[in-house]
Amino acid sequence: MNQVAATVVDTDVFSLMYLRRANSDSRAAGWRQYLTGRRVLISFQTRAEVLAGARSAQWGNRRMAEAIEILDRTPTIRPDNEVVDAYAELVAECRRLGHGLQARDHTGDRWVAACAIAKRIDLLAGDAIYQGAPNLVVRG
């Protein structure tokens, strides 16, 4: 039996590929090609960021319902013990290495990375902060 390769997508990729109505970002074509035939997953952090962004932007009922439907159809990695352990290890290693992901304003990014690390799945992200992060396979 062939297993479908999976990819965790960061919030920027998820938003651009699945939620934006006008898509003129030059990275979209490459991301679409990479994701073709792959199982797309998101982190609980991405779900939270999408919902917070939509509520802050005061999306209308229809657009909010569409976003929730898309989120509900997308497998979401929850913060189980593996994810929490991966997060703790990532924090310690980033501090030891002086990697930028250690910064306070990257807490959400660390959770996304920890989800990918814990489940041994690559991460597709448009944010360069992930490059060189320990134990993380990044595509972008």
Give residue spans per PLM region.
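Active-site neighborhoods of divalent-metal-dependent phosphate/nucleic-acid chemistry enzymes
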Residues: 2-3, 75-122
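A generic structural signal for short hydrophobic patches within well-formed alpha-helices
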Residues: 14, 47-50, 84, 130
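Generic structural signal for small/hydrophobic residues in well-ordered secondary structure
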Residues: 10-11, 50, 87, 116
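Short, well-structured N-terminal submotif of metal-dependent ribonuclease cores
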Residues: 1-43, 52-69
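Acidic active-site catalytic centers that drive phospho-/nucleotidyl reactions
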Residues: 10-12, 109, 127
